[in-house]
Design a protein with these regions (language model features):
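Signature of uroporphyrinogen-III synthase
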Residues: 1-269
Length: 269
């Protein structure tokens, strides 16, 4: 295989500003031309005090569950302010995926639970299995996530009998500053791929320019994000088998190696 398997491919990245660089680097290393258009921006949650109060009593929780790198950053800041970094580092941690786990380990967390599939349903199942169904009714769990995140993780844990406190770490809003550039990119048919690494970015994309692709193919990081896109009427051509940014790049590379399979749908005319 060529060392630049995505050469000649123009890829749109919709991740938030300040968080797209790693994904961009991976894509460019594979030979792609990359345009970034952050469809969302991260802002403080409606009540920042919830996370601060939870961070002050981390040692009271049997599990601290974190669902994104962004949530790790904000939890760490709150824990530092509450002088509870030791409780964070020595607590029983669970992360939705390897990037989140790596961010926790960078804070000194010795180990944390990561599910084999990087989604809330799988994480809930792993926590239940690791705790034991008979002991879960006595467990207190702190769930650190985005405001208005998918409720499935909390619902599964509560349904299994756990007591769950949700601490919103940040909120997501549509980044309207990119509407003009994004519309031009789509209307001129400049892209070969539109990539989405979160359902929130997919929803914002549709709010900004509607359910149109400009002839580009659509790639999603996970079945959850793919379902969000499909729900808006956007065709999804690729879903990463491993729900991570490297996994999404791998999926694009694999598709580039089979151009005939997607040629019928990839038409800029």
């Amino acid at each position: 295989m060529t060392s630049s398997p995505l050469a000649g491919q123009h890829v749109l990245v919709t991740r938030p500003a300040g968080q797209a660089e790693g994904f961009r680097t991976l894509l460019e290393a594979a030979g792609a031309t990359v345009t970034t258009a952050p469809t969302i921006r991260l802002v403080p949650p409606s009540d920042p005090g919830v996370l601060g109060r939870a961070a002050a009593r981390l040692d009271e929780y049997d599990w601290i569950v974190v669902t994104s790198v962004n949530a790790v950053r904000r939890l760490a800041a709150a824990a530092a302010e509450a002088d509870s970094m030791c409780a964070l580092a020595t607590g029983r941690l669970a992360a939705v995926g390897p990037a989140t786990a790596d961010a926790l380990r960078a804070l000194g967390v010795a180990d944390c639970l990561v599910p084999p599939a990087y989604r809330g349903e799988a994480l809930a199942a792993e926590i239940v299995a690791a705790t034991g169904a008979e002991r879960l009714s006595d467990a207190r769990i702190l769930l650190v996530q985005a405001e208005r995140a998918r409720p499935v993780l909390r619902e599964r844990l509560v349904g299994a009998g756990a007591g769950v406190d949700v601490a919103p770490a940040y909120a997501v809003e549509v980044n309207r500053d990119v509407r003009g550039a994004l519309r031009e990119f789509i209307e001129l048919g400049l892209g070969d791929w539109l990539t989405f690494t979160a359902s929130s970015a997919a929803r914002a994309f549709v709010q900004l320019v509607g359910a149109q692709t400009g002839g580009a193919l659509v790639a999603a990081i996970s079945p959850v994000t793919a379902a969000t896109l499909s729900g808006f009427g956007l065709p999804v051509h690729v879903v990463a088998a491993t729900h991570s940014m490297p996994g999404l790049v791998d999926a694009l590379v694999a598709s580039a190696a089979r151009p005939g399979r997607l040629a019928a749908t990839h038409d800029h005319a």
